[in-house]
Amino acid sequence: NNVNNPTTPREFKGKAFAPVIPSFQYAYNKGRWSLQAGFALTGGGGKCTFDDGLGSFEKIVAETALAACQLAGAVDQVAAQYGVPAVFTSDKSFGKEGKYSYNSYMHGRQYYYGLSLGAAYKFSDNFSAFAGVRGVYASTNYYGYVENIKVGAMPLYMVLDPTKETAANIELSCDQSGVGFTPIIGVDFKTGKWNFAAKYEFKTRIRLKNKSVNQVPSIGNLPDNLRNAYIAGGVPEAAANAIIGNPVIQGAMGQLKTQFDAKLEEAIGEYADGKKIAGDIPAYLALGVGYSPVNAVRVNVGFHWFDDKHATSYNNRQEKLDRGTLEYNAGVEVDVNKKITLSTGWQNTNYGLSDEYMDDKSFVVGSNSAAVGGVYHINKKMDLNVAYFHTFYQHKKTSEKVQLSANQSINYKSDYTRNNNVFAVGLDINF
């Protein structure tokens, strides 16, 4: 019953644009040793804006509108016993149909900066091993709001605090930061035309500290404001007190407050000021096999496993996953001539998603990615790399039934997906 957007299903589209995501790698080789360092957004990063807010924000408004109309009906029914005409279910107030309107917006930014240091040692011409550590600094920001909420023809602030037009607004403004460390080990074995490699990154424990300035409505003043509205409309004070003090009305208002507070906690409780939030990076296993049938051709296949089930997140959300993430990839690289190398690759990503895990504030879906790339060998010391890949995301559909009262419920259906294009440029320099 969104009067500003009555179409169903409704689309909530987020736009992300990252023009530059830099990374640097450095290796110093001497004898059997290789000292290595790198800087990159290893734990993920980017910005996304939802100009019309999120579906979970509208869910709060929609359920509040229905609950408000139920309360209005109960109040007017009790008021009739005292000869007071229906006020709150009239078309000039909440009405009876649960219609609502609101304005909303959401913007998120997340960067996990990683600085890696490590060393590799060549035990023989065929076998080498690596050990290192990555320091991770996490920095995130979330800003969003739900404002100008109206149920029927009644601005919601009028029954929360008539003197303050922003009394019903929900506003989120949160900065998060945290630090973690990732131990890394790896091995590499070469024999003839074959190359076998494995790497394991241990789980990175990160606790994000919130610094927030949030605003949430309070329904605690609802009884007094309804009572004052009656008196301002000419209803005797004794009758107004009797109507609002009726046990049925008191119970309905208590239930409304409990449900509203629970919805707010679910939506933005994670971002309360001063909280420390778990934001672990999962352990990661990578296995790879390379084969070169001729000197100019190299074929690679790989497997990745992310132990998401044991990477702690807010309210142990990771426990809702069926399993960790599995990735399979393959690629071919061909030296066309002394100056040009071309390549192509594919990757399948499969998450262990469940309906309960999905959340529009942060979600992933399975995908297939295809890429093409090339290297221009400028000279013996410099190579210019370019690449493009597109990710074909799957759809994850969920359904949920929310019981608002003994005789009223809402069924929600959601369809999550994404779209992604990446262009990359790199420069290799051999000193």
Predicted regions and their residues:
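Outer-membrane beta-barrel porins/channels
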Residues: I21, A27-F431
